[in-house]
Amino acid sequence: SDVCSSDLNYYGIMIDISHPSKEAIKQMIELSKAPVIASHSSARALRDHPRNLDDEQLNWVKENGGVVQTTALGAFLTDRKDPPPNMDDFMDHIDYMVGKIGIDHVGISSDFDGGGGIVGWKDASETMNVTAALKERGYSESEIEKLWGGNLLRVLDQVQEIAAKMQAGEL
């Protein structure tokens, strides 16, 4: 709702759109004065999963200045069981979203605490495999920095700046 979005903006809390309905996501983005994040969602165009974002939703996040963090949760990446979801599936979602909404609006999420993990990135000890796969796909060091947290930190800074302006009565 508008009250909730306004309160979250006022206190500098990032709004996460990963679980709500499409209509609720649209409303939250429209009502937020700050960029939003999808902390663990992938591309519905590649895997029709209800938690993934469709192209229209991806564009809403881009227009809002936010970030969508694709997640290494196999069920969000593919419906294929054999072979099990792997690094190529994960990279395909990153590539798709970067192509669709730009490098500044995409990030990486493991979702290890929610059952995440794929062949090649089952736990934190295999995290370097993600960076290696990004390099193999042609991403530059600066692009990899954005994907690994730079974009999320940018949004956090913007959320904090908007909160400060709201608290000062400037917004």
For every predicted segment, state its role.
Residues T71-A72, K100-A124:
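Short acidic/histidine-rich active-site segments
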Residues K122-L171:
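Mid-to-C-terminal alpha-helical segments outside catalytic/metal-binding sites
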Residues I13, S18-E23, S41-R44, L73-A75, ...:
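Active-site beta-loop-alpha junctions enriched in small/polar residues
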Residues D54-F76:
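Aromatic-lined glycan-binding groove of carbohydrate-active enzymes
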Residues D2-S5:
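Short, small-residue-biased leader/transition segments that mark boundaries at the very start
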Residues S21-A34:
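Distinct, well-ordered alpha-helical segments
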Residues Y11, L31-I37, E63-V67:
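Glycine-enriched alpha-helix->loop->beta-strand junction motifs that scaffold or abut catalytic
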